[in-house]
Amino acid sequence: MSRNIAVLLSVGVLAGCATTKPEPSAFEAAEEAIVAAERVGAEELAPVELRFAREKLANARRGMESKQFDIAYWLIEESEINSELAIEKSRTATARRKVSELSRTNEILREELEANYGEQFK
């Protein structure tokens, strides 16, 4: 019973969103998310996700022009999600690079210690 009520409420919320024109702040938030992704290097580190975010935001604008507010609303949301994914993938790639660099530095130091002090540093 409560599950049916939850489903009906969800459908009602979705139906309400479908007829409501997205606020300009929704577009601003999506744009800011794209800029944030660019700042963390998504152009290089997560280009596909960043491209999807840009395309979906552009499509949302077209949806607004043709008064397809429900489509525009969902495309704005998808744009933000793709931007967030681009941010996280970029951060992950950056962290992996740092770990790799530090591992290599540790290996070099270990080799130098072994060369200078022998097997006691293994």
Report each predicted region and the residues it spans.
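Pro/Ala/Gly-rich low-complexity, hydrophilic intrinsically disordered segments
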Residues: 85, 89-122
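Post-signal-peptide N-terminal segment of Sec-exported extracytoplasmic proteins
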Residues: 25, 35-78, 119
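A structural signal for well-ordered alpha-helices, especially hydrophobic packing surfaces
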Residues: 34, 57, 61-64, 83, ...
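Bacterial signal peptide processing site
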Residues: 18-20
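C-terminal motif of bacterial Sec signal peptides marking the signal peptidase cleavage site
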Residues: 14-16
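Short, low-complexity, disordered segments immediately C-terminal to signal peptides
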Residues: 22-31
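Bacterial N-terminal signal peptides that target proteins for export
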Residues: 1-6
